[in-house]
Amino acid sequence: LLSRRQRQMCIRDRIDSMNFEEFAKNRHSVRDFAVGTVDESIIRKAVELAQTAPSACNRQSTRVHYIQNRDICKNVLDLQGGAKGHTVSSVIVLTSELSLYRHTSEFKTPYLDSGIYLMNLLYALTYYGIGTCPLIWNDDGEKAEEIRRFVDIPWSEQIVAIIQVGHYATNECKYAASNRRAVFDVLKIH
């Protein structure tokens, strides 16, 4: 459990009055979701918006697997290992189609492309009023094989990330009080 949390009115209730800077600074990972899944039409709209993400040579390798079945969601989250205690609503498994990368020098590119897509998808889901929590995916290969037993993910796709998605549980969101590093700690001008 997180020791410190902050509360604020959910971004979905204020989004129409925000510019991009306010929107970006107010997107937070949430872990408390209402019971029920997100309608497929909202997921489709968010994915369509996320498709504006750039990718190397415009390959657009990222694939989105939306899982609504509660038992499958639980199995995926158990394999992920870091989402224990979180309410389960729906899960997205983000993958990258490896066949689109032909050279060994590109072995990191699927992760880069999908990471950019992931951020775009998080923004898109937030824009449509859906709460998200991206979950780290560390795998030795066995976990991905196990997930493929529950979800029809082709072998040519590498699992890159898992995102817990759902409607906000209440009008007041709780999120981890994680301060961002100061710009001077991150930006180096040469």
Question: Which residue ranges define each predicted feature?
Answer:
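Single conserved hydrophobic/aromatic residue that forms the stacking wall/gate
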Residues: 1-11
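C-terminal helix-cap and adjacent tail motif
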Residues: 5, 29, 159-190
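Eukaryote-specific, low-hydrophobicity, charge-rich regions
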Residues: 12-45
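Short alpha-helical scaffolding segments that buttress acidic/His motifs in well-ordered protein cores
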Residues: 24-27, 46-50, 92, 163
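Glycine/small-residue-rich phosphate/adenosyl-binding loop
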Residues: 41-48, 55-115
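Small-aliphatic-rich amphipathic alpha-helix that forms the alpha element of a beta-alpha
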Residues: 50-51, 92, 100, 105-147
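Short coil/turn connectors at secondary-structure junctions
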Residues: 86-90, 130, 155-159
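Short, electropositive alpha-helical surface patch
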Residues: 144-158
